[in-house]
Amino acid sequence: EMCIRDSWDNDKTGLITNDFNSPVINFKNLNTLTDYMAQEALKSPNGHVRHIILTEQGFTATSQSRGNVPQIQAAAYAYSYYMVDSNPYIDAYILSRQVDAPSEVRSGLSFGLWECSMDRGDDIVATKRRKIWQVFRDIDKKKYTLESSEFAKPIIGIEKWSDVVPNFRWKALEK
């Protein structure tokens, strides 16, 4: 199983590179995708870079090898949000689930901002907010953005967001 952490720590795999031949595009090398789309041959007829919408994105809060990992889920979201927010060619970033789906949870996937009731069949009934919910609520607010994502830096292994996020929007607020 690929660990959620691999999203920002997969230089070791050799699958994530910052060139157009990268076998995998993920949040760590997201700029490679938008740089690719900025090539002349791929621009719109009026010469503009085509913008991208990321849909059905998500990070699971459960891991078969590590159990319940809501802090890692929230850290992965914070990292991915900052990568998207700082890229002018990403128009939207849509998460897969607001609330876990019981059928997915039974398969080991817990993408929601909320946990779900597991005693209601496949009905999706929210029961408890996860850490990601608070990050989702506050990460785009100037007053709270860095505070809401501070917990994620040691998980990811960084001192500053601007060290890993190109054109980090909130760099002036960092200490």
What is the predicted function of each stretch?
Residues T62-K175:
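Aromatic-rich peripheral "rim/lid" segments of glycoside hydrolase catalytic domains that contact
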